[in-house]
Amino acid sequence: MDSAFHFYYEENLMRLRQAGAELVFFSPLSDSRLTDVDGLYFGGGYPEVFAPTLSKNKSLLNYIRDLSYKNIPIYAECGGLMYLSKGIKLVEGEFFPMLGLISATSIMEKKLKALGYVEVTTKKETIFGEVGLRFRGHQFRYSDLELDESNPIELVYKS
């Protein structure tokens, strides 16, 4: 956890521990490598505020990309999803490259884009379980995810 990614649900961390995971915390702002890990979890936060620093940490960006090519599970929520995208475009128009693991660009807006509770149902089997699982969550964001139409993303849930 660090200043860029610090919104984590305690229940999620507890469930990971109950499943046998040893949680290792790190900072995408300052760490250049990770210890041996079997998966990555990026919580919410304010990556847009720290976009220049996150974008400059090339050694960690490359290291995480290499891990993704080895097909380790990577889970991200909100700001973490922005970090997985091609990059973050700030309100002022400045663009900062990120991991590029998702064919989309995170675009910051001046006005609130979403606030409230959501419920989704899985359409495919995922690391969380079988088809038809229902999840509840909430949204609070000033960003949109602009999908790259030339490389579409298959969503594994429906709202």
Segments the model singles out, each with a brief description of its role:
Residues M1-A4, R141-Y142:
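G-domain G4 guanine-recognition motif of GTPases
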Residues F5-N57, L61-L67:
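Phosphate-binding active sites in nucleotide-utilizing proteins
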Residues Q18-E22, Y69, A104-I107, L145:
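Generic secondary-structure signature for well-ordered alpha-helical cores
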Residues A19-A21, D38, K70, P97, ...:
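Structural beta-strand/beta-sheet cores of well-ordered domains, especially the beta-sheet scaffolds
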Residues V24-F25, Y41, A76, Y83, ...:
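Structured core elements
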Residues P47-T126:
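Cysteine-nucleophile active-site neighborhood
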Residues M108-S159:
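Amide-donor transfer/coupling interface in amidating biosynthetic enzymes
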